[in-house]
Curated annotation (Swiss-Prot):
GO cellular component, one term: cytosol
Catalytically driven reaction(s): adenosine(1518)/adenosine(1519) in 16S rRNA + 4 S-adenosyl-L-methionine = N(6)-dimethyladenosine(1518)/N(6)-dimethyladenosine(1519) in 16S rRNA + 4 S-adenosyl-L-homocysteine + 4 H(+)
Protein name: Ribosomal RNA small subunit methyltransferase A
CDD domains per record: AdoMet_MTases
Keyword annotations from UniProtKB, A to Z: Cytoplasm, Methyltransferase, RNA-binding, rRNA processing, S-adenosyl-L-methionine, Transferase
Pfam families the UniProt entry points to: RrnaAD (PF00398)
Annotated localization: Cytoplasm
Any one Gene Ontology molecular-function term assigned to this protein's record: RNA binding
Length: 295
């Protein structure tokens, strides 16, 4: 099998050989530009001293580029029809393991321990994520505290904008905070829709997430912190007070007391959630947690 998978001609040849038909339900769009693959591996910072988990290898175009540079690659593929294709296209590489399964249901830490011969090496996660499942996968990896020092994803540009957003912009929201609380986020480059087969309706972007040594702000209860941030963006055009009072009805009889307490730490309830940065949300959630516990 030729190593140059990521061209229109080679991709078409592989798909015809196996009679492969794209499943819209799985959001399958295969890259057909090897230059983009090189930029992804460069952005991810892959070396022979790193292990890589890839999610959704497709027919192996990105996988082979990762294998050329990394120590070992473990790729999660949910579509069983692609397994024999991957066996064929990646047969020249002995440092790739393909795991058939849904990464959302997988014990990723167990896979790391079992599949990598040198599991102590730094781990990087790289993926061309299906649009429909982008957010659940990223949040699972963060929630499960997978020991990856960075994650590099190609995803819908709109989602990349939301992940890398700053306060007081239309893209800034609870997803921004959920990710930037743990990771530094950089939108690396835009990927035009024309370099995919089949061609999607929108452009993509590659985003690079680097794990922070410590979360961006100190919170007393992370679960409550994220509950507060989600509530604050429930209706973007409403004030903090309206959104929080809707989520926590116990605040309503004590509004004056709450306003006074929050003003003392520099937070005005007439602001909208989109104007608060992460440290301010941390102050807000820590205060609210104590306030709601008071008799």
């Amino acid at each position: 099998m030729s190593k140059d998978i990521a061209t229109p001609g080679k991709t078409t040849e592989i798909l015809k050989k196996y009679g492969f038909l794209f499943k819209k339900s799985l959001g399958q769009n295969f890259l057909i530009d090897s230059n983009i693959l090189t930029r992804i591996t460069d952005t991810a910072g892959i070396s022979k001293e790193t292990n890589v988990i890839e999610i959704g290898p497709g027919i192996g175009a990105l996988t082979e580029q990762l294998a050329k540079t990394a120590n070992e690659v473990v790729a999660f593929e949910i579509d069983q029809r692609l397994l024999p294709i991957l066996d064929d296209t990646l047969s020249a590489y002995n440092n790739i393991q393909v795991v058939h399964g849904d990464v959302l249901k997988a014990d990723v830490e167990e896979v790391i321990t079992q599949q990598f011969s040198k599991s102590e090496l730094p781990l990087k996660i790289v993926a061309n994520l299906p649009y429909y499942v982008t957010t659940p996968i990223i949040l699972k990896l963060l929630h499960d505290n997978i020991p990856a020092d960075s994650m590099t994803f190609m995803l819908q540009k709109e989602v990349a904008d939301r992940i890398s957003a700053v306060p007081s912009t239309k893209s800034y929201g609870s997803l921004t905070i959920a990710i930037q609380f743990y990771m530094e986020a950089e939108l690396a480059f835009i990927v035009p829709k024309t370099v995919f087969m089949p061609q999607p309706n929108v452009d993509s972007a590659v985003i690079h997430l680097k794990r922070r040594k410590e979360p961006l702000a100190k919170v007393n209860d992370e679960e409550f912190f994220f509950e507060v941030t989600r509530a604050s963006f429930a209706q973007r055009r409403k004030t903090l007070w309206n959104n929080l009072a809707s989520k926590f009805p116990a605040l309503k009889p004590r509004k004056d007391e709450l306003v006074e307490g929050l003003n003392a730490i520099g937070i005005d309830l007439i602001r909208r959630g989109e104007t608060l940065d992460i440290p301010e949300f941390a102050k807000l959630s820590n205060f609210l947690a104590d306030f709601l516990e008071e008799k």
